[in-house]
């Protein structure tokens, strides 16, 4: 098969190679592996405590007995399906099935409680598929261009992007920037426990072997979202699954579109701006090595708030479909974008693509600038499989919605018991350390009381996830610059990002609390958007 060069703009050859990739995926054995990947990915994403990275790690050695295109294709499909499926448990139980779905809990679970379960899941399905498809198309046609962009970036830029993400955390704190910032800083502090990533020196371990390995963010996620919600449900005596989510339940929009694969225009009309902007933005975030789909979801949620009228923006966090569509579009696009540095530079864009890189090496293949030319059939098989996986997610909209709607028929006591079981098993299975169970219980109880006093736990978890990504880039940048902080302002991209981070943090305070903000909105015609 002739392999076209995307960089040369040979679009017809790219399409020809992509068609050949589809043909390869549709062979009986590869098609079987494709459906295995979809099933494993959705299960690992939807079950609390499991995640796509863990499943890819477990399946990677098995691929050694397969042809490279078959095995690596299956791993890519598992990743794509798991990123989407993480939203299912986030919506049903307020338990993110993957770190990428943390932001989805903010509106997905309240929609469930408001009787809009069908609408929430259906919105997540469509937004995930749309973001994944657009991200994969950008990957196919523009990966060399994006790789050139990524290779120009270094530690100052990576730190600046994550700093901007941390600044955006202040917008998700239930309207209280001070409390959100406090929780985010606490999460950053939790991220420094363990061994120093650059020097190997123990920090805040208190001579404890357990703390030397750091605080696992999966354990914290299970505690603050799952176990705390169980405590809340026991105390309130309410229903974990909101009423009205069944047939005939939900809003008019739900009745018109949820559970149907024949109404994409309804979604495009309502979420068009969010889908378009967040697909591109999520892909670009995914291209940055180390940023990953979790960062993409954070950017997507906050961008989504700025792409809707003020009347909708003020309801973010209380259960609006836009709050589900925004992060789901971005995180699935970012998952596709993470393949750009992997395939073109040999640099993983996320934890899961790092495992997929290991699978490449296991098969004697080293990703890099010449991979598309030397391993064209393999690369285009992966491209085709990613497209098919996201289309499959869209086509599975109706059966997936109907399947998960059945959860509301499970007795409340049994459902809470199952969540506790999955939470305990998930906390232990992550690292096989019994002390993680006590950590999970501790954070669960703490989150229960924090939320009673209106402290949002999401900023804390985001701080814990992003902190360990930001610290090495910050310290390497300062080491190379001899401790000169101006290194972040001498590079255009990092200077712009840090400036945006400062503005992102302070402008909402000015715009929302002063007459000056009202005059600015009137001067630039922003009052129309806010109606």
Can you say where each PLM-predicted feature lies in the sequence?
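Short helix-coil transition sites and intra-membrane helix breaks within transmembrane domains
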Residues: 44-54, 91-102, 134-138, 285-294, ...
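A structural-propensity feature for long, helix-poor, extended segments
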Residues: 79-91, 97-98, 319-345, 349, ...
